[in-house]
Amino acid sequence: MAIRNFRPYTPGTRTRVVTDFSEVTGRKPERSLVVSKHRRKGRNNRGVITCRHRGGGHKRLYRVVDFRRNKHGITAKVAAIHYDPHRNARLALLFYADGEKRYILAPAGVQVGQTVVSGPDAPIENGNAMPLSAVPLGSSVHCVELYAGRGGQMVRTAGASAQVMAKEGDYVALKLPSTEVRLVRRECYATLGEVGNSEVRNTSLGKAGRRRWLGRRPQVRGSVMNPCDHPHGGGEGRAPIGRSGPVTPWGKPALGLKTRKRNKPSNRYVLRKRRKTSKRSRGGRDS
């Protein structure tokens, strides 16, 4: 897989960078694994906006993805690599030996025609799923379960992988993409390898219209609003926000405020907290 650059024929193509979709082999999704899904557009059950800047975009059909990998011991053949409009990762269409079809997240390096299998006795190969107790130390895994049998909940985005650091007792230490080291039960399943389509981090939309196609509406700075709409609003001309630090539209501190509870029960499983990715001062860009 590679990325594709464009010549500046128009302002929208000047900075446009996209993936070339060379790894995608299937044109249409498997009809038995596609369902319709109502788009919430950032609203809750009462119709109130709970997530701003959402709405519009191209219509989508949801692909049912198998995050559990619970067909143990049954080999499956990779029939095609499909595009998924709901995520950056690609999907691998599996044809199982018993005739069932399922989608999984396409691991990096998995090719059409390759066979994968899940279970505690699965071989150590990319795309195979097994308990963390059977994964060798230092291996990269993705689609990691937090609770056994619930399905993969962590490390599912394109290009992501976690590293098995240590095993002790009933737990396995994983180094997550955020650099956090966390304990996970040894019976939880994970898939070997990293998620494919890692080059997506190098892409650029190029124009505002492509962001609208994805269902993202414009973000307006609070400093250009009226005081009735945002705490940063008001003043004459380009006035400062008039506060010691930026706040949300509802007056709560923004940009750097930790929202995780100090006494959260799962803190006991975090061996090392994630490192900070940026050092923004409290006088940074307002929300």
Swiss-Prot record:
UniProt keyword Ribonucleoprotein, yes or no: yes
PROSITE patterns in alphabetical order: RIBOSOMAL_L2
Keyword GTP-binding applies: no
SUPFAM superfamilies: Nucleic acid-binding proteins (SSF50249), Translation proteins SH3-like domain (SSF50104)
Residues annotated as signal peptide: none
GO biological process: translation
Gene3D superfamilies for this protein: 2.30.30.30, Nucleic acid-binding proteins, Ribosomal protein L2, domain 3
GO molecular function ontology, one term from the record: structural constituent of ribosome
Bias kind Basic residues: ranges: 258-287
UniProt KW keywords: Ribonucleoprotein, Ribosomal protein, RNA-binding, rRNA-binding
Pfam families reported for this sequence: Ribosomal_L2, Ribosomal_L2_C
Annotated Gene Ontology cellular component terms: large ribosomal subunit
Function comment: One of the primary rRNA binding proteins. Required for association of the 30S and 50S subunits to form the 70S ribosome, for tRNA binding and peptide bond formation. It has been suggested to have peptidyltransferase activity; this is somewhat controversial. Makes several contacts with the 16S rRNA in the 70S ribosome.
Protein family (similarity comment): Belongs to the universal ribosomal protein uL2 family.
Subunit structure of this chain's protein: Part of the 50S ribosomal subunit. Forms a bridge to the 30S subunit in the 70S ribosome.
Protein name per the record: Large ribosomal subunit protein uL2
Origin species: Parasynechococcus marenigrum (strain WH8102)
Lineage of origin: Bacteria, Bacillati, Cyanobacteriota, Cyanophyceae, Synechococcales
Gene giving rise to this polypeptide: rplB
